[in-house]
């Protein structure tokens, strides 16, 4: 194991009685890295996270943290802490009591408890909420407390299971920014689970795109977005047009990599179908012989077109897929 590796999964298999689960998973997470497991419901991402945390037993394989095998340790014996979507705060305890709970179990002296909790409340921007109960706070505030409580345990690896999915869009975006700042400032190693590609792209050092219990691609957000290795990844991440070719292959091109001009030409001809303002950019769809193609244009460009106009589309950067599993530039 490299000296920079904090967490390693070696041929990890976790199966349920139904036979579903994940098989032969191999992954390394470096110290201070935030790695996101991204995929649709049922792909196995939460199974992996809960297996790392010890909440689901591994069928075979190994989980190592700092080179030490923790595969068969109970959750409370592992150097990990987990934050759930449902917050898991004790409703009958105040914020302070919730945050002190784990420290008491670890027999941390009271003075040290108070010091750590005061510092953590400041870090998660919840100073002054010590005497409030969970039911008196918003979802975002409760999640701040849940994250702070986990960080108080000073875990080697922090596990986050879709922690922001119950929050509205604006609060979710704010919480993402705050988590990333805390993670970077403290140098914490994090494994994050989400089905939200925007969340994964915004937060992650690396993303693991999952499909039916396997890894489709592991890479930086830029690598995943710009160089998807399979049609599945290309379709799952961001917007993508799939254009069938005469030789049976498919061209995949993102809306921002298509340009439009008036009239007909040698590329892809069609007629303007819709022009929609989506904030700082305009989405245009064009009816062509091979189906509807989506592209993004500026507001200034949009003023030059109207529904029904004949146009020609020029494809910029694209990838060619010969089947569902491979791609070529």
Model-flagged regions — what are they?
Residues 34, 73-229:
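ABC ATPase nucleotide-binding domains
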């Amino acid at each position: 194991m490299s000296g920079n590796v904090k967490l390693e999964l070696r041929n990890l298999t976790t199966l349920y009685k139904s036979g579903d689960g994940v098989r032969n998973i191999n992954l390394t997470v470096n110290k201070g890295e935030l790695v996101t497991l991204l995929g649709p419901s049922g792909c196995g991402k939460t199974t992996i996270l809960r297996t790392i945390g010890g909440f689901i037993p591994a069928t075979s394989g190994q989980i190592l943290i700092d080179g030490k095998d923790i595969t068969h340790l109970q959750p409370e014996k592992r150097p990990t802490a987990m934050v759930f979507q449902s917050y898991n705060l004790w409703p009958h305890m105040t914020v302070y009591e919730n945050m002190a709970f784990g420290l008491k179990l670890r027999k941390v002296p009271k003075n040290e408890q108070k010091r750590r909790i005061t510092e953590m409340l400041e870090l998660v921007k919840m100073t002054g909420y010590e005497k409030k109960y969970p039911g008196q706070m918003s979802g975002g505030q409760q999640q701040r407390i849940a994250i702070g409580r986990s960080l108080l345990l000073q875990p080697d690896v922090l596990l986050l299971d879709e922690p922001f999915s119950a929050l509205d869009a604006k609060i979710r975006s704010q919480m993402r920014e705050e988590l990333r700042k805390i993670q970077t400032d403290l140098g914490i190693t994090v494994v994050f689970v989400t089905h939200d590609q925007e969340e994964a792209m915004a937060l992650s050092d690396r993303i693991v795109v999952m499909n039916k219990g396997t890894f489709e691609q592991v890479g930086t957000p830029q690598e995943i977005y710009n160089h998807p290795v399979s049609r599945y990844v290309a379709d799952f991440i961001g917007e993508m047009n799939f254009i069938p070719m005469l030789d049976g292959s498919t061209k995949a091109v993102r809306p921002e990599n298509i340009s439009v001009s008036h009239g007909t030409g040698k590329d892809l001809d069609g007629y303007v179908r819709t022009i929609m303002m989506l904030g700082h950019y305009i989405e245009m769809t064009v009816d062509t012989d091979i189906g509807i193609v989506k592209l993004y244009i500026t507001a200034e460009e949009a003023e030059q077109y109207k529904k029904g106009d004949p146009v020609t589309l020029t494809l910029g950067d694209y990838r060619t897929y010969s089947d569902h599993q491979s791609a070529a530039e």
